[in-house]
Amino acid sequence: MSKKNYSIELVADMLSTSKYVVNQWVKNKSIRSIKPNGKTYIPKNELKKFDKLSFLFSKNKFKKPKPKKNYKIIELFAGCGGLALGLEKAGFKCVMSNDIDKDSCDTLKFNRPKWNVLHKDISKISNKEFLGYKDVDVVSGGFPCQAFSYAGKKLGFEDTRGTLFYEFARVVKIIKPLICIAENVRGLTSHDQGKTLSNIINVMEEIGYDVVNPEICQAIFYEVPQKRERLFLIGIKKRSGLKFTYPNKISEPYTVRDALKKGRLYKTNVPNSNYQKYTKRKQQIMRKVPPGGNWNDLPEKMKKEYMKGSLHLGGGKTGIARRLGWDEPSLTLTTAPAMKQTERAHPKENRPLSIREYARIQTFPDNWKFS
């Protein structure tokens, strides 16, 4: 990818469609393509045809927010701190964070010793404990997507009891912050035929919050060099007079090169750190895969050896023997970079991504240590 040309894959990701659809546009000459070095690219100017991508040509630059005061937040289901850290960068002060996972809490405590980190099942934290945070401005968190039990009726707050969303809503109801922020997987929009999301919005309305039109945000448009989509639900306290608009998108997505090398995103190359090792034979196989390639790039004999019985199964299997490309955003990172179905190999070296490379692609600072 250059600033003037985008790959088929990236255009598909930007438009939330498939490579097949984009290839059909190219084949039908609906959009113009070029083939430098034999690979198909779409000139950036061709993307003016899509209203969804008009921001790529906007003169309004991406602006980082500047808070008018020191807002306080509580972060629920905090994990290792990605969302809380992002809010901190935006000027918010985290006064309490909670997660059930010990390693996640240890990570938060090590990196932010002044934060009040509760390693506890959220359902075991009493209402009384949360009453001590009535001055908090924002409650945020990414509760897991769960189905609700109902018989065709519209659910109220108490009907969601037993789910982690109920716990999120319980805290919001107690503290009554100006804003609540919930992030979740894209699949929540279609979960249980859309009923899960509809009931979540109904409950937020019941406890006193107007939900801004839910939006699926693509990380590549917000200074993150990774193809990751997340659904954001923003609740605004009723009669607060507040208005919310989603931030401007950047005009040029960041790439793996930006994440791992000195340049636009970081002032230094990525520091060395631990990584899993491939077997000797796996290294020999991965040497045949070019940057941005996968098992389809292997010689036929090696394909049969590596793919075995899955060679003739359906599906693209594009995650197998997958090597990241330098000049594209990273694929969505998984918890297992060396697992065969979800491999994320270094663009050049014959190995999975390292811990610090994983962190950089998610825009964690180099001094953020993981337990």
Question: What is each residue range found by the language model?
Answer:
Residues 128-136, 146-318:
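Class I S-adenosyl-L-methionine
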Residues 20-25, 49:
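DNA-binding alpha-helical recognition surfaces that contact promoter or target DNA
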Residues 5-10, 28-56:
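Short helix-start
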Residues 19-20, 281-371:
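C-terminal target-recognition/interaction regions appended to catalytic cores
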Residues 1-21:
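Polyanion-binding surface elements
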Residues 26-27, 205:
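Alpha-helix C-terminal capping/helix-coil junction sites
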Residues 55-178, 186-190, 195-198, 205:
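Core alpha/beta nucleotide-donor-binding catalytic domains of modification enzymes
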Residues 43, 232-236, 334:
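Short, well-ordered beta-strand micro-motif
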